[in-house]
Amino acid sequence: MTRELLARAPLENVSLPEIASRSDVARSTVYTIFGSREGLMVALAEDLLERGGFARIGQALRGPDVVRAFEISMDVAMELYSQEEPVSQALLSLAAVDRDASSAAARLNFGRAQGMRRLAERMHEQGVLRDDVTVEEAADILWVITSFETYAQLRRGRNLTPTQVGERLLGMTRRTLYRETGDGRRETGSGK
């Protein structure tokens, strides 16, 4: 019920009494389960991550060829972002004006910065990064490229399909981060 309320009107104050009423349970039941409105919002974020299968992104990133692993992870991310777009967008919009929702939004991004740092280090170790790009710069660029907010801007602002968004983001990554191969092309992963 919380997902539906939030997606329907993201900037409305989604209250525990309304959620309890629409779920046909007592308000005290919601408090017993979640502890607070913030707890409910964080549980919603956890559900979004689990239901969306976001663990698949991490699995993809562990592939031996870092470029190919990143490409696969981006394909997975675009699929998941599109599946969970209404609730993710609503939660992130509400987070700008609601402290309880901001905790939930932070949960959605938990670990992504560190993960992108590790990815940038692997790119450096495998000789993928351009010489003029530091690991720290690469991590920052990857952090922006992999965010839901970046996906949403291209999806809605440029009216692109999820596949097109992924292609644009991978193109940006190649041109910004990857060194040229001996034949003047950019790294593209062993599978391409």
Predicted segments with their positions:
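Short hydrophobic clusters on alpha-helical segments that form packing/core surfaces
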Residues: 1-6, 77
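Generic hydrophobic, amphipathic alpha-helix propensity
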Residues: 1-3, 19, 29, 44-48, ...
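Helix-turn-helix
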Residues: 5-39, 43
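Short, flexible, glycine-rich and Lys/Arg-enriched loop motifs at helix boundaries
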Residues: 8, 12, 44-67, 128
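Short helix-capping/turn signature of helix-turn-helix
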Residues: 34, 93-98
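Hydrophobic alpha-helical connector segments
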Residues: 37, 43, 56-83, 109, ...
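Amphipathic alpha-helical packing segments from all-alpha helical-bundle domains
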Residues: 75, 79-92, 100-126, 136-140, ...
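Hydrophobic/aromatic-rich alpha-helical bundle segments in the mid-to-C-terminal region
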Residues: 124-172, 180-187, 192
